Amino acid sequence: LFNLDTKIILRISGLPKLNFIRKFFWRIVSKNIFLVTCASDETKIAITKLGIFSENKIITLCDPIINVSYFNKKKKVELDKNLQNKNYFLSIGRLTRQKNQQLLVNLFSILKKENKNFNLYIIGDGEKKIFLNNLIKKLNLSENVFLLGHKENVFPYIKSAKAIFSSSLWEDPGAVMIEAAFCNTLVISSDCMSGPKEFLENGKAGYLFENNNIKSLKNSLDKFFNENLDKKKEKKIFAKKNSKKYTIFSHYLALKKIIN
């Protein structure tokens, strides 16, 4: 099928739906593929088990998520004065089924009933906006949960948040989680496919909860509240270390090693 001198690298992010056409195409081109790169070890293991590509062709290659110079410039911007000194948690992502923000809205309904005075800021736009707005009103959370829409610069929000929630049903491994870790902000993430558990080292570098399980999410948040500052600092250090694997420079070095 291919008669080229160029080395062909197939990048796989997450676990794509393997319909007949995709399987058929992958099997045809598999012999001509130089490498298959996966964004996490979890995805690499899953792709290897399919038996379509030679195991020695499948590697993990961290995505180039962090542009350090851009990051350092953007994080210097001050947060809107109306939002400063607020006790808030943060969620960033498109308002879609995948991101599952309704789980967080329901969580903050529980917190309100417990008289815990915290806010949730949700940054992003998408097809679930009307649904989420209606849910916020239905649960009487208009003074607790706020849809802020799209923001060009999210870093001032990240660095000032108590923690970042990642409630996704699936990721690989999750750009916002990595950006938060680079900002030294703690992450509370769903244990979804593929990658959050790996990045957060099964809780060593953050907090994990069972995917789409509000009871488990509440337990993780309670753990966040109850852990001492030294333990939280330790988690931040491990997460920051892991986030450095996702800089553009780290990606360049890894690619250079692979290609050469």
How would you label these PLM feature ranges?
Residues T48-K49, P64-N82, P156:
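Acidic anion/phosphate-binding donor-loop and adjacent secondary structure
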Residues D230-K245:
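A short, well-ordered alpha-helix in the C-terminal region of glycosyltransferases
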Residues I8-F34, I52-F53:
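A conserved, positively charged/aromatic
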Residues N202-G203, Y207-I214, D222-L229:
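Conserved acidic donor-binding segment of nucleotide-sugar-dependent glycosyltransferases
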Residues L186-S190:
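Short hydrophobic beta-strand element within catalytic cores of glycosyltransferases
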Residues H150, L169:
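Aromatic "clamp/platform" in nucleotide-sugar-dependent glycosyltransferases that forms part
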